[in-house]
């Protein structure tokens, strides 16, 4: 994904520079190249893993709190640790 973003930026800047140098509005070859560089599958993260599966895996995983020792679901761990550390200070 990051490679595609970089390619899109390079092609865009190259097209802008070429248009200004030639005083033209558009270069069809570069437009075609930019169209071919579009992401084919937007449901994947930068490592090529499916986003919907990752959310389910992390939310169902349990973590143990080092402060109180309880096991907390991954989706609620940040909220728990915030309250748990706040209680310890009082």
Swiss-Prot record:
Q: Name one GO molecular function term.
A: zinc ion binding
Family annotation (Pfam families): Sgf11
> Which InterPro entries does the UniProt entry name for this protein?
SAGA_su_Sgf11
* Keywords, sorted A to Z: Activator, Chromatin regulator, Metal-binding, Nucleus, Transcription, Transcription regulation, Zinc, Zinc-finger
Q: Which domain of life is it from?
A: Eukaryota
Report the principal subcellular site.
nucleus
Report the GO terms under cellular component: DUBm complex; SAGA complex
Instruction: Report any one BP term from Gene Ontology.
Output: chromatin organization
Localization, per the record, is:
Nucleus
Zinc finger intervals, SGF11-type: 63-84
Q: Which HAMAP family does UniProt cross-reference here?
A: Sgf11
Its domain comment says: The long N-terminal helix forms part of the 'assembly lobe' of the SAGA deubiquitination module. The C-terminal SGF11-type zinc-finger domain together with the C-terminal catalytic domain of UBP8 forms the 'catalytic lobe' of the SAGA deubiquitination module.
Family that this chain belongs to: Belongs to the SGF11 family.
Job description of the protein: Functions as a component of the transcription regulatory histone acetylation (HAT) complex SAGA. At the promoters, SAGA is required for recruitment of the basal transcription machinery. It influences RNA polymerase II transcriptional activity through different activities such as TBP interaction and promoter selectivity, interaction with transcription activators, and chromatin modification through histone acetylation and deubiquitination. SAGA acetylates nucleosomal histone H3 to some extent (to form H3K9ac, H3K14ac, H3K18ac and H3K23ac).
Under the subunit heading, UniProt states:
Component of the 1.8 MDa SAGA transcription coactivator-HAT complex. SAGA is built of 5 distinct domains with specialized functions. Within the SAGA complex, SUS1, SGF11, SGF73 and UBP8 form an additional subcomplex of SAGA called the DUB module (deubiquitination module). Interacts directly with SGF73, SUS1 and UBP8.
Provide the protein name.
SAGA-associated factor 11
Organism for this UniProt entry = Lodderomyces elongisporus (strain ATCC 11503 / CBS 2605 / JCM 1781 / NBRC 1676 / NRRL YB-4239)
Organism classification, top ranks?
Eukaryota, Fungi, Dikarya, Ascomycota, Saccharomycotina
């Amino acid at each position: 994904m990051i490679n595609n973003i970089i390619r899109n930026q390079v092609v865009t800047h190259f097209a802008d520079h070429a248009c200004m140098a030639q005083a033209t509005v558009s270069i069809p070859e570069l437009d075609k190249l930019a169209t071919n560089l579009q992401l084919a599958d937007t449901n994947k993260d930068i490592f090529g893993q499916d986003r919907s599966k990752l959310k389910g895996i992390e939310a169902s995983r349990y973590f143990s709190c080092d402060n109180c020792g309880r096991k907390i679901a991954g989706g609620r761990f940040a909220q728990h640790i915030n309250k748990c550390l706040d209680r310890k200070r009082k």
